[in-house]
Design a protein with these regions (language model features):
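Re-entrant/interfacial helical elements at transmembrane boundaries that shape
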Residues: 124, 157-168, 181-182, 195-209, ...
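Membrane-interface alpha-helices at helix entry/exit sites of multi-pass transporters
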Residues: 126, 133-142, 171-183, 211-222, ...
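Hydrophobic transmembrane alpha-helices of multi-pass solute/ion transporters
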Residues: 38-110, 123-127, 131, 283, ...
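Membrane-embedded alpha-helical segments and adjacent helix-loop junctions characteristic
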Residues: 82-175, 324-386
Length: 453
C-alpha cells in the first residue's frame, strides 16, 4: 500500500541530483563492456515490467543488475586509468542518495502502516460504500477524491483505497469496475503531478531546485484537464444504474487514529522545515517524527493494554514496511547511477535534448513513462544535467507524472488495481480508453503552454 509514499518522499532525499555537475563520467559507451551493461539493465527491467505474470519481486532483478553494472563500471574505470578515489566518489554519490531515501521512506511507510492498523483507511472506505451513490455519481466522486487524495498521499495508496470502494459497490457490475478503475488510474497520476508531495518525480524536481515549492501549483489546471478530458468521455459509458443495497457496517477508528494522522502531517512539516530552514537533510526530520510515534506507541500500548492481545507495536509496523520497494529503489539508484558513470546519460541527453529540443524530449519522457516506471526516467533526466527554464522543468514534471496513465502497466496504481480487480480491469480494458487518455495528455500539455508558456 505504501510503495510510493513514494510520492513525495524520494525527491526530498536527493541532495545533488545532477551528477554531471560534480562527477565526471568515463565516456566509454562504445565499449563492449559498456554495451553489455545496457543490455543487463534492459533485461532486468523486462522482469520488472512482467512482475504481474512472473510473480518475481521487482527488487530482485534490479539489484542484480545494479551489482553487475557497477562491477563492469569499476573494470572500465581501471582500464581507463581512473584513480580509485574518483570511482569511489561516484559510487558513494549513489550510496548517499539511497541511504537518505531508505530512512525517509521507512518512516513514511511506518506511519502509513500505523494509520492502516488504526482503521483510518478502512473507515473512509466504509463511509463511502454506505452512501449508496448511483454508478455515475460514484464514478465522479471516486475520481475527484482520488485526484486530491493523491496530491497529498501517493497514487498507489489513493488508488487502492478508493478502488476498494469501487469493488465493493460494483462487485456485480464488471463494466463499472473496469471503467471506474481506469478513471482512478488517470485521477491518481494527474493528482500527483501538481503538488510537491504528490509524486516522487515532482519532488525530485523540487529537491534538485529547478523549481520553487509553489511553482508546482501552476500545474494544477493542466493536471485537472489531464483528468477531466478522459473522465468526460468515459462518463457516458458508465451504467446509468443504481447499485444493489449493501449491509456495510460503519468501521470505528481505533484509539489514537486521529492523533497518528496529525503526527504524520507534523512529521512531514518537520522534514520540510529541516530542509528549508535548517538546511539539514529531510530524513532527519522524518526520524524525529518516528521517535514521536514510537513514544506515542508506548503510551497506546500501556493505556489500552488488553490481556491476550499484542496491542500497538511500533516495531511490527517497521517490520511490515514494503521492503521490496525499498530494495527496488536501491537497484534503480545504483543501476541508473552506474550507467550514468559509464557515460550513457550524457549520450541520451545529447540525443534527446540537443537533437530533438527540450519540448519534444519532455513530451517523449511522458510517453516513455507509460512503458517504463517514471522514477528511473526522471532520475535519468535529472542526472543528465540538462539546462532548461522553469517552463520546461514544469513540463517534464507534468508529462512524467501523467504519462503512465496511458497504459495499465505504466504506473504503480494501474498495476495494483489489476491485481485487485478480480480480472474485471485488465491491460486490454484499459487500452480501450487509451485514445481518450492520450487526448487528455495532449490537452494538459497545451493548457500548460497557454497558462505558463
Amino acid at each position: 500500500m505504501v510503495r510510493f509514499l513514494l510520492v513525495f518522499l524520494f525527491a526530498l532525499l536527493v541532495p545533488e541530483m545532477v551528477m554531471a555537475e560534480s562527477l565526471t563520467s568515463l565516456d566509454m559507451t562504445g565499449t563492449q563492456r559498456g554495451i553489455f551493461t545496457v543490455l543487463i539493465f534492459i533485461i532486468s527491467y523486462g522482469f520488472v515490467m512482467t512482475e504481474e505474470f512472473t510473480h518475481l519481486r521487482k527488487s530482485k532483478p534490479v539489484i542484480l543488475a545494479a551489482g553487475i553494472i557497477w562491477a563492469h563500471a569499476a573494470i572500465l574505470a581501471a582500464e581507463k586509468g581512473v584513480p580509485t578515489e574518483q570511482m569511489h566518489a561516484a559510487f558513494e554519490h549513489d550510496l548517499k542518495e539511497y541511504a537518505e531515501l531508505m530512512l525517509f521512506l521507512l518512516v513514511a511507510m511506518t506511519y502509513i502502516n500505523s494509520m492502516a492498523e488504526r482503521n483510518v483507511f478502512e473507515a473512509l472506505r466504509s463511509w463511502l460504500v454506505r452512501r449508496q451513490f448511483g454508478y455515475r455519481k460514484l464514478f465522479l466522486i471516486t475520481g475527484v477524491i482520488t485526484f486530491f487524495l493523491s496530491s497529498v498521499a501517493d497514487n498507489l495508496t489513493a488508488a487502492l483505497l478508493v478502488g476498494a470502494v469501487v469493488m465493493a459497490v460494483g462487485a456485480d457490475n464488471p463494466k463499472f469496475v473496469s471503467i471506474g478503475f481506469v478513471n482512478l488510474v488517470v485521477a491518481a497520476n494527474a493528482g500527483g503531478a501538481f503538488c510537491p508531495f504528490g509524486d516522487i518525480t515532482t519532488l525530485m524536481v523540487w529537491q534538485a531546485e529547478y523549481a520553487e515549492f509553489f511553482d508546482f501549483f501552476k500545474l494544477f489546471i493542466p493536471s485537472a484537464v489531464n483528468y477531466a478530458v478522459p473522465a468526460a468521455v468515459m462518463y457516458f459509458a458508465v451504467p446509468d444504474e443504481q447499485p444493489k443495497e449493501t449491509n456495510e457496517e460503519a468501521v470505528q477508528l481505533k484509539p489514537g487514529a486521529i492523533q497518528i494522522c496529525v503526527m504524520f502531517l507534523l512529521t512531514i512539516a518537520t522534514a520540510v522545515s529541516f530542509k528549508q530552514a535548517l538546511h539539514l537533510p529531510p530524513f532527519m526530520g522524518m526520524m524525529v517524527g518516528l521517535s514521536v510515534l514510537m513514544i506515542y506507541g508506548y503510551f497506546l500500548k500501556t493505556k489500552y493494554y488488553v490481556e491476550g492481545e499484542d496491542g500497538f507495536d511500533i516495531f511490527n509496523k517497521v517490520r511490515h514496511a514494503e521492503w521490496d520497494t525499498l530494495l527496488f529503489f536501491f537497484g534503480v539508484v545504483f543501476a541508473v547511477g552506474g550507467l550514468g558513470y559509464i557515460g550513457y546519460l550524457e549520450l541520451l541527453s545529447s540525443a534527446m535534448y540537443e537533437g530533438l529540443g527540450a519540448t519534444t524530449a519532455n513530451i517523449m519522457v511522458g510517453l516513455i513513462s507509460a512503458i517504463v516506471d517514471n522514477i528511473p526516467v526522471m532520475f535519468a533526466v535529472l542526472n543528465m544535467g540538462v539546462d532548461m527554464d522553469l517552463y520546461q522543468w514544469l513540463l517534464v514534471t507534468l508529462t512524467a507524472g501523467v504519462g503512465g496513465s496511458m497504459l495499465s502497466v505504466g504506473s504503480a496504481a494501474g498495476v495494483a488495481l489489476m491485481g485487485q480487480s478480480d480480472h474485471k480491469y485488465t491491460f486490454f480494458s484499459h487500452l480501450k480508453w487509451t485514445p481518450a487518455i492520450a487526448g487528455g495528455y495532449a490537452a494538459s500539455i497545451l493548457t500548460h503552454y497557454l497558462i505558463n508558456g
